[in-house]
Design a protein with these regions (language model features):
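Short, conserved phosphate/pyrophosphate- and ester-handling motifs at nucleotide-, phospho-/glycolipid
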Residues: 116
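Active-site signature of alpha/beta-hydrolase-fold catalytic machinery across serine-
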Residues: 122
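Alpha/beta catalytic cores of group-transfer enzymes, especially the acyltransferase/condensing modules
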Residues: 135-159
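ATP-binding N-lobe of GHMP and related small-molecule kinases
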Residues: 2-113, 125-137, 142
Length: 159
């Protein structure tokens, strides 16, 4: 990907603190109520969009917190960062664009602040700008939860 981007998309999502009632909102709990507080620092996504006309689409992920940069195999496989790859897979991104996806959060992974969920929301929100129509913030959050439960088969509540 050497040509200049046609478009640059930036998206952010807050991490969360104070997970009161966590895990009461899962399918196996029946019903529950969770109180989260979204705070700074945000999870950040920046996507450089370039034309891929006339050749196979290329998607590059730069997971800055992990110091990893790699090309996503086509068709998309869940290999290096399944959460990120599943987000790319669930969105119907046009085939005629190359994507260079940069992801970063000041909050470290595994810190119990919902960083992974925030990264998913920011990435899905950015990818939504490449697809027809627009999802609401609530729909983006629900889609992020579907990525974890349906695409990856994980147990998770709604953050």
């Amino acid at each position: 990907m050497t040509n200049a981007p046609e478009r640059i998309i930036n998206a952010t999502a807050p991490i969360r603190v104070c997970d009161l009632g966590g895990w009461t909102d899962t399918w196996f709990a029946g019903r529950g109520t969770v109180l989260n507080i979204g705070v700074y620092p945000y999870a950040e996504t920046q996507i450089f969009v370039r034309s891929a006309r006339g050749r196979t689409r290329e998607i590059i992920i730069n997971a800055e917190n992990f110091g990893q940069r790699y090309a996503v195999p086509m068709p998309i496989e869940y290999e290096k960062h399944p959460l990120l790859e599943a987000c790319l897979d669930i969105m119907e991104v046009p085939d005629d664009v190359d994507l260079e996806v940069n992801l970063y959060s000041h909050a470290p992974p595994g810190g119990s602040t919902g960083t992974s969920a925030a990264i998913s929301v920011a990435l899905l929100g950015a990818l939504d700008l490449l697809t027809p129509g627009r999802l609401t913030p609530h729909e983006i959050a629900a889609l992020a939860q579907r990525v974890e439960t349906e695409k990856l088969g994980l147990q998770c509540g709604i953050q």
